[in-house]
A protein has these predicted regions:
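Selective transmembrane helix interface/packing segments
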Residues: 1-254
Length: 254
């Protein structure tokens, strides 16, 4: 039995004719990311249809609970309503992250977060918002001066520290999700091989038939999937969201 853990598949290449840019790749990560966006958009449309002030539906009640949870998450970690403008951005990051992590529960889909480019794009957006808030709080000159503190010789280290923020956010999330996929894949493949070897010891046609059925692969991979996909996926989405809130809030405070 073969089990591919080599990475996202490339479905198509679109030549750009520009040597620097190379070809535009339509990858498995890109396609599944579109599916994730469609799922989130569909849920938003479904939950926000026919909104009412009184006698609200169960669907609207769920929508209000989600909005209230997102609002409380931001306000409880920033000390008030000052950063309410972050709520839509933070909610989008969390929703995209958790759906991307959990979509791998469907066997035909590979989680987009198992591709570093996904987390890197999120981290770049967060980094831009952090930098914009720092400049807004202290001005451009104040932002540049901050790299020379407490003494000018620390400037290279301060620059590295600034760049390390998006890198660490992206790599932390990516590493946890990818490791789960790799471990699941290795265990599934190992159990399939063990199943074929053990059942192949049975005499006659029965052993020959059962050796081609990965019986041992049923059960344990599913249990591991509950941990790596559900628990770790939800936890990493929460951690990335919390770091986003704290970094941007701290930047705005100067």
């Amino acid at each position: 039995m073969e089990f591919d853990i080599s990475g996202a598949k490339i479905f198509a290449r679109i030549p750009t004719g520009i040597p620097v840019l190379g070809d535009i790749l339509i990858t498995e990560t890109l396609v599944v990311s579109w599916i994730v966006m469609l799922i989130i958009t569909g849920l938003c449309i479904f939950l926000t249809r026919n909104l009412k002030v009184e006698k609200i539906s169960k669907r609207q009640a769920v929508a209000e609970m989600i909005v209230e949870a997102a609002t409380n998450l931001v306000r409880n970690n920033t000390g008030g309503t000052k950063f309410d403008n972050l709520i839509p951005f933070v909610s989008t990051i969390f929703a995209t992250s958790i759906v991307s992590n959990l979509i791998s529960l469907i066997p035909i889909f590979r989680s987009p977060t198992a591709d570093l480019s996904t987390e890197a794009s999120w981290a770049i957006l967060v980094f831009i918002m952090i930098t914009a808030n720092k400049i807004k709080a202290g001005g451009l000159l104040g932002y540049m001066k901050g790299f020379t503190e407490p003494i000018p010789v620390m400037t290279p280290f301060n620059i590295l520290s600034e760049l390390a923020t998006p890198v660490s956010m992206a790599c932390r999330h990516f590493g946890n999700i990818l490791s789960g996929i790799v471990i699941n894949g290795l265990i599934y493949a190992a159990l399939a091989i063990a199943s074929g070897a053990l059942l192949g010891l049975l005499p006659g046609a029965v052993g020959d038939f059962l050796s081609h059925i990965p019986i041992l692969s049923v059960g344990l991979p599913a249990i591991l999937s509950v941990y790596f996909d559900w628990f770790t996926g939800a936890m990493q989405a929460f951690i990335f969201t919390m770091l986003t809130i704290m970094y941007i809030a701290n930047a705005a405070e100067g």
